[in-house]
């Protein structure tokens, strides 16, 4: 049976024309809409372009002024650093030396593009908001020294200096561990009046020596723990029994050891009252087996005296992975994204500039290939580069850079404890 044919409805000419007209109108509307959209997009692009252009122009104008701050540096150091920031056409340079009692972290962050100071409590307070140091700058120095927020320029060092004759007389090498240093001290008792000495009356030397002993006994973790405690406490009693590591390292254990040293003949009975002239007198008279000081202070000792002493890193009983060299670092920070400041920071890290800086200050350069002032400065760079923790600030800079009265009080309490 055949299917019936489907009936097709005929469309009249009039209807067809109406449909074609409607379709044409729809096409016209679509084209118009597209043109409108295109016009709007072009407008947006134009506005964005204008905004970007205005921003670029404003930034260029803003970057023309480079504001540089110095804090806690000697006049000579400030002048040395200024020389490496060139006066260029259309660039306005503003230099400020911030006085000891006028440092305000918030104000400094908002006002300046660059800051030069010693790494420590102050730089830590600004680190979170600081700009990254350009990678090309960091690549000039050993990996362990690369700090992208606070880049080291020169290194000082908390050192032990050994009387070479005492080393020879005892038949011992420079100690590699703190246990070996204790053996040296005991062996030196029959050779010199005071196997150990330091300028204990000077607050910075006193607190730095305590820090070196904590690093020697408990390592970097214990050292950092002590820094945290000293920053929030103002008395010796508050930190005396805080456990600094997983073992038995406390400030009390360190001070008890020092309290016994004079009784054991290891140091002068009043070492904690020693001053610069005392150390110099004993060293010149060949009465010291070793002494603790900063490299920068070592440089002030006359050559005819210091030539008889061999500088070394403070020996430790911890693994290399838990150790940082206590080496105060003259450092630079970028506090804004000023493009000219980012250019200028690179000027401090050429091989020639680093060699010049080391010669002028007698401190250690950080550039891998720069010539150091002498073997002592070269050793400091090598030791810092070889430590897992790199160069770390001394306790003075880490906890008391802006708290001299609190430091004076604490050191007075330490002297009372060990006497």
Feature map (PLM): residue ranges:
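Extracytoplasmic/periplasmic substrate-recognition and gating elements
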Residues: 303-364
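Glycine-centered hinge/linker elements that transmit conformational signals in sensory
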Residues: 224-272
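A ligand-binding cleft/hinge motif common to bilobed small-molecule-binding domains
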Residues: 119-127, 292-309
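Short helices/loops that flank or line small-molecule/ion binding pockets
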Residues: 101-115, 166-167, 183-191, 275-291
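C-terminal capping/gating helix-and-loop segments adjacent to ligand/active sites or protein-protein/ligand interfaces
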Residues: 326, 355-419
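Periplasmic solute-binding protein
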Residues: 142-176, 200-234, 326-333
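Conserved N-terminal structural module of periplasmic/extracytoplasmic solute-binding proteins
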Residues: 3-121
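Hinge/lid segment of periplasmic solute-binding proteins
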Residues: 116-162
